Amino acid sequence: MIFYTLEHILTHISFSLVSIGITIFLITLSVDEIIGLYDSSEKGVIGTFLCITGLLVTRWAYSGHFPLSNLYESLLFLSWSFAIIHMFPYFKKQKSYVRTITSSSTIFTQGLVTSGLLSEMQQSEILVPALQSQWLMMHVSMMVLGYAALLCGSLLSVALLVITFRKALRIFSKKKAFLKDSFSFVEIQYRNEPSNVLLSTSFISSKNYYRAQLIQQLDRWSSRIISLGFIFLTIGILSGAVWANEAWGSYWNWDPKETWAFITWTMFAIYLHTRTNPNFQSVNSAIVAFLGFIIIWICYFGVNLLGIGLHSYGSFNLH
C-alpha cells in the first residue's frame, strides 16, 4: 500500500512537471529572450528525471523485478533515458540545440506515459516464465537505451534536413523573384542605395554563417548520439541472442521483433558507413537517419500491435 501511494504521488508530480514543462517549452519556442523561462524548463526536466527514477525504483521494490515488462514501464524507462541524454550537454554548460530535442522528447514521452495510457496498462504484472531471467535487465535496458539515443540523434538529423531544405526553398524563391525583375531596375536601385545593399549583404552573410554553424553542430551531435545508440543496440541484440538460446534453444528465430530489430541495426550501420565516406554529404546521412527514425517506431510500437511471435507476451508488451 505504501509503494502504491508513493507511486501515485510521483506520477502526479511528474505529470504536473510535464504540464508546466510543455507550457514553458512552447513559450520559449516563440520568445527566445526570456532566459529565466528556459532555465525553468531545464530544471523541470531534471525534476521529471528524479520523479521517473523514483517511479522505477518503487515499481522495482514492490514487483520484485526490474520494471521493463510492459509498454508502460518501457516508456517510463525511455523517458528516463531521454532525460539522461539531455543532462549530459546541460551539465557541461554547452549551449547546444541537442537540449531542445532531448527536453521535448522527455516531456512529450512522459506526458504520454502519465496521461495517454489506460490505467490498466499501468498496472504491474507478474513476469511470464520466459521473462524470469537475469538477462531481462541487461537485454531490455540496452535496447531501450539504444532506442532513446537513436531517436534523439535521428531527430537532430531531421532538424538538419528541415533547416537545409528551408534554405534551399528560400534560395529557389529568391532566384525566381530575381528573374522577374528587370536588369535596369536592379541597376538603378544599386546606384541609388549602395549603403543599403552593403548592409543587406552583411546581414545575409552573418545569417548564412549562423545557419552553417547550426547545421554543423546538429550534424556533429547527431553523429555522436547515434554512434552511442548503435553501441547500446548492438549490446542489446547480442545479449538477447544469448538469452534466446537459454530460453528457446536458438540464438535467432526471425520472429517479427527480432527481424525489425535487425532492420533497425542495419539501417544505422548504413548511416555510420555514410559518415566514413567523404563523398557523402551530411544531408545524405541525415536522410538515412530519418528513415531509421521511422523504422524504430515500427519496431517499438508497430510490431507489438501484431501480437504475434516469440516476443508477444500480451497486448503492447515490449519484450
UniProtKB/Swiss-Prot annotation:
InterPro entries hit by this protein: Cyt_c_assembly (IPR002541), Cyt_c_biogenesis_CcsA (IPR017562), Cyt_c_biogenesis_CcsA/CcmC (IPR045062)
Family: Belongs to the CcmF/CycK/Ccl1/NrfE/CcsA family.
Transmembrane segments: 9-29, 44-64, 71-91, 143-163, 225-245, 259-273, 286-306
A Pfam family this chain is assigned to: Cytochrom_C_asm
Protein name per the record: Cytochrome c biogenesis protein CcsA
Superkingdom, natural source: Eukaryota
GO MF term set: heme binding
Keywords: Chloroplast, Cytochrome c-type biogenesis, Membrane, Plastid, Thylakoid, Transmembrane, Transmembrane helix
Transit peptide keyword on record: no
Entry's localization field: Plastid, Chloroplast thylakoid membrane
Any one GO biological process: cytochrome complex assembly
Membrane topology listed for this record: Multi-pass membrane protein
Protein function: Required during biogenesis of c-type cytochromes (cytochrome c6 and cytochrome f) at the step of heme attachment.
One GO cellular component term noted in the UniProt record for this chain: chloroplast thylakoid membrane
The keyword Repeat is assigned to this record: no
Cited NCBIfam families: cytochr_II_ccsB
Principal localisation: plastid
Subunit structure: May interact with Ccs1.
